[in-house]
Amino acid sequence: GVKATLDHCTDGELISDELAKEGLPVFVGPTLGSKSKAELRHKSFTTPGALYHAGLTVSIITDAPVIPLEKLPMCAGLAANAGLPMEEAWRAITINPARSLGIDSRVGSLEPGKDADLVLWTADPLTTIGAEAYCTIVDGKVVYQAE
């Protein structure tokens, strides 16, 4: 069968009880930016936390290139600041989207046999706006190293 997800879900907080009955994984975003369309008028960084507390598997998205991908950690941090537990904020940008898309056997967490992709930061990128990547590893090989 078809494995469905609910994408964008920017105002899903308003119907979190109904969404919980369906149990579909939700992808929330883009939340950063203006409320330029009618369907965005209720968007808020409280939505990921509300959906998580309703029992849903939450992923956070930027809808890149609408909001640049490098803003993803900041979006997760803002969701944590608005009620999503910090550990769940990390899951919302790592293992949750991988599981929801059925690719968690390869990516989403650091485990033997999975792709060895990793970014090392100067500080926690979810809580520190000035955090910078100082080392990036792809397939187990260093592809970027800050000077």
Predicted regions and their residues:
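Short aromatic-centered micro-motifs
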Residues: T136
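Short, solvent-exposed mixed-charge patches
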Residues: A146-E147
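Short, small/polar residue-rich loop motifs at catalytic or cofactor-binding pockets
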Residues: I129-A131
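Catalytic beta/alpha-barrel core
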Residues: K3-G12, T31, K35-K37
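His/Asp/Glu-enriched, well-ordered alpha-helical/loop segment
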Residues: D17-P25, G29-G33, K37-A123, T127
